[in-house]
Each structure stands twice: as structure tokens, then as C-alpha cells.
Amino acid sequence: MTNVTGTERVKRGMAEMQKGGVIMDVVNAEQAKIAEEAGAVAVMALERVPADIRAAGGVARMADPTIVEEVMGAVSIPVMAKCRIGHLVEARVLESLGVDYIDESEVLTPADEVNHLNKRDYTVPFVCGCRDIGEAARRIAEGASMLRTKGEPGTGNIVEAVRHMRQVNAEIRQVANLREDELMTYAKNTGAPYEVLLEIKRLGRLPVVNFAAGGVATPADAALMMQLGADGVFVGSGIFKSENPEKFARAIVEATTHYEDYELIANLSKGLGDAMKGVEISTLLPEQRMQERGW
């Protein structure tokens, strides 16, 4: 079984504290304050939301530290920031700034197409994306304290987040029903470390929280992901690319909390204005699919 150190328990515990909440992408102090006032449990500080990163193309990097510090100074809730996959120095810079979490994120252009960070080397906890139990288990083995679906960021299309959440949860059920002497073969076939699979089998769940991310654009989307077993919700472009960010932010927070109250969700959805413009996944070229980054 994976040896969980005291530091690792603290990191995982910090992520557990966000359970049931909404984490919102913000690009400045004003947006961070809107998110906090709407009830977000944390914010993700970055230069551009995923929809703008997708539209701009080119190489997407860690945000200017000035933006991160501005957001940190504006709110009392935890602040996260993204680094590129495998970028040792971006991660160290963000850690030195004092962020509460680092997202080793496929939304940014990977710095290393072979290696992810050894997240156990850092004091700050990490969140990482996953599409299946193999990716989830590898990130946990590297020291991730929190997971999220990859979805397809910046599209306003929930279909990929749904696919990833269902896939991970189906595979958790499969692992739970395997005999222990069958786990090694399963580990070989999925690329999932055996010790992590053993921990998942014994717990009957992932040992870290798994949030929904990538395509959440409406209160109903958020409630859907919670019903599918998400521990909480990340909203990237869905808030500040909508017609009325303040209303959307509050509505998504409420829908995440009361995800089985359909009358409330109906009322929350009234008069919100237009959600962000969505993208049909089938129209994306292979190189435009952010979820394919990392392994």
C-alpha cells in the first residue's frame, strides 16, 4: 500500500476542505472578488481563461506573478495557479509566491511531453487532470493531492467531463470487485501503479478528491457533474464568458450545493442571460484537444 506521509495527509486534507464547492478561474482582482462574493471556495489565478487561451493559440505559459499576487491580495479564500506539465521552475516560482495549490495543467502548453512533475518534492499541494483510472493513479503516485476531470477546457461543452467522470467511477467499481491477485494484471493493462490500485480497492474510492472540470457552463452542468459523483466543480471560462458573470457565479455555486433540488435549479436558471458560446467537440482538430496532453 502507498506510504502516506504526514505531509501528504495534510495536503490531501486541504483538498478535502474544498469538497462540495466551486473553484473559479479569474484573471484579476475584480473577478476574484466576484467569485468570492458568489461563494466560490477557491479561485484559480491565470492570465487568460481557457476559452481565450484556445482562441489565441501559440504557447500558453504560467501567469505573470503580478497577476497571481494581485489575486492573492484581493481575497481571503485559497488561491490556485497553473503551471505547465513538467515545468519544474514554474512550479517552484508559484510555490515561492505562496499559492495554496498548483494545477499542473494541460490547459497550458506542456513543457515536458514525457514526464510530469514529482509532486512529492513540493510543500504546496497539487491538482491534476485525469480521464481514466490509469491517469488518476499515476498522478496520485506522483503526489497529486486532488484530481479533476480534464474535460475539454474552454469549450463550454460538458460532454468530455461527463465521459471522464463516468470512466473513472466505472473503473473504480471494477477495481473494487477484483481479487487482489488480479490487480497486477489490471495495473499492467492500465499503466496504473499497483500500490495505488490496492489503496483504491481497499477504500472503494480514490484516495483523493476528484472534481469536475472542462466544459461546465450552466447551473445544470454543475448539478449534473455532482450527480455523477464529482466532489466539487471547477468553472473555467463559463463564468466570465457568460452574459452576466455575477448571476452565473452565484447560480452555479447554488446548483453545486443543491444539485438534487430541481425546482431550485430551474429558478436559478431563469433570466441568467446567455451562457458562454459553446464549441462542438467534433469540430476540434486533434492538436486542439487539450485533454490529450499529458499521459
Swiss-Prot record:
The keyword Lipid biosynthesis does not apply. This is Pyridoxal 5'-phosphate synthase subunit PdxS. It catalyses: aldehydo-D-ribose 5-phosphate + D-glyceraldehyde 3-phosphate + L-glutamine = pyridoxal 5'-phosphate + L-glutamate + phosphate + 3 H2O + H(+). One of its GO terms (molecular function) is pyridoxal 5'-phosphate synthase (glutamine hydrolysing) activity. Transmembrane segments: none annotated. D-glyceraldehyde 3-phosphate binds at R166. D-ribose 5-phosphate binds at D25, G154, G215, G236, S237. Keywords: Lyase, Pyridoxal phosphate, Schiff base. SUPFAM superfamilies: Ribulose-phoshate binding barrel. InterPro entries: Aldolase_TIM (IPR013785), PdxS/SNZ (IPR001852), PdxS/SNZ_N (IPR033755), RibuloseP-bd_barrel (IPR011060). The keyword Glycosyltransferase does not apply. Its EC number is 4.3.3.6. Pathway: Cofactor biosynthesis; pyridoxal 5'-phosphate biosynthesis. The active site is at K82 (schiff-base intermediate with d-ribose 5-phosphate). In the presence of PdxT, forms a dodecamer of heterodimers. Belongs to the PdxS/SNZ family. CDD domains: pdxS. NCBIfam families: PRK04180.1, pyridoxal 5'-phosphate synthase lyase subunit PdxS. GO terms for biological process: amino acid metabolic process; pyridoxal phosphate biosynthetic process; pyridoxine biosynthetic process. It holds the Pfam family SOR_SNZ.
